[in-house]
Amino acid sequence: MKKIFISMILMLAPLAAAFAQDVVGKWKLEDGSAIVEVYQQGDVYNGKIVWLEKPTEADGSPAVDDKNPDPKLRTRQVLGLNMLSNLKKGNGEYSGGSIYDPGNGKTYNCSMKVEGDVLKVRGSLDKRGLIGRTMDWFRVKE
């Protein structure tokens, strides 16, 4: 009986690991324009842009955050920019944080949920997530 119990535990361990989906890693945006690396910092999760489809402007200079509402930040490079901030893990999702869109210079409330190799990222105007949109990001296998 003891051997059967141990065998069952050994067989179920990989299954449990599969259900414990981790958000940490690299994710490609649904339009393929960027890759964001999600990382844990203390008890929160953040994400920075680590790859851009178009990393430079037409003149060859690095793409910058030119739509930022803060004029002092409009010269910072988009590559390396933190776009996900302060997401906390709880109840199978990550929430309570924000997502910054360098395409329009706006910051939205954010929640995320891992579904296999897809990260469902919801940006919304309200904290409950009622007014917004959900994007699918795809895990980058290394």
Q: Which residues are covered by each model-predicted region?
A:
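Sec/Tat signal peptide C-region and signal peptidase I cleavage site
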Residues: 15-20
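Structural recognition of beta-strand segments within beta-rich domains
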Residues: 28-29, 129
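Ligand-binding face of N-terminal immunoglobulin V-set domains in extracellular IgSF glycoproteins
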Residues: 122
